[in-house]
């Protein structure tokens, strides 16, 4: 199962703040590898082209839908989401699908 998220950061953030926040989100989310059962791969892209309308993308692969469900409430994921992502993002788009 793939779990793809696209975020836009809040408009009031400076370019320097956005760069630091994107790096922190990348470190936090990619640091979940090996901590969450069923999480096979996790990559965060923070270097979109100027033509993009999102600031960063999470690309994860899970063993199955049950693993994705467990990830959503896992304390390590919740800590990263609440501490490093949600305070700084204004939009979130999610697509989950079978591969």
Regions found by a protein language model. Give the residues of each.
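Short, glycine- and small/hydrophobic-rich beta-strand elements in well-ordered beta-sheets
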Residues: 30-57
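Conserved RNP beta-strands of RNA recognition motif
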Residues: 5, 58-60
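Short, conserved charged micro-motifs
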Residues: 13-20, 68-70
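Short coil/turn motifs at secondary-structure junctions
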Residues: 10-12, 49, 63-67
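Residues that line or immediately flank small-molecule/substrate-binding pockets and catalytic motifs
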Residues: 8, 46, 96
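An amphipathic, aromatic/His-enriched active-site/gating alpha helix that lines ligand/cofactor pockets
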Residues: 26-27, 31-35, 39, 61-95
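Active-site-flanking beta-strand signature of metal-NTP-handling nucleotidyl enzymes
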Residues: 1-9
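Hydrophobic alpha-helical membrane-association signature
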Residues: 21-25
């Amino acid at each position: 199962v793939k779990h793809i998220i696209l975020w836009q950061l809040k408009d009031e953030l400076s370019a320097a703040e956005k760069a630091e926040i994107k790096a922190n989100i990348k470190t936090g989310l990619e640091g979940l590898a090996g901590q969450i059962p069923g999480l096979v791969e996790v990559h965060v892209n923070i270097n979109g082209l100027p033509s993009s309308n999102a600031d960063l993308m999470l690309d994860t692969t899970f063993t199955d839908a049950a693993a994705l469900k467990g990830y959503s409430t896992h304390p390590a994921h919740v800590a990263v989401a609440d501490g490093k992502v949600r305070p700084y993002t204004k939009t979130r788009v999610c697509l989950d699908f079978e591969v």
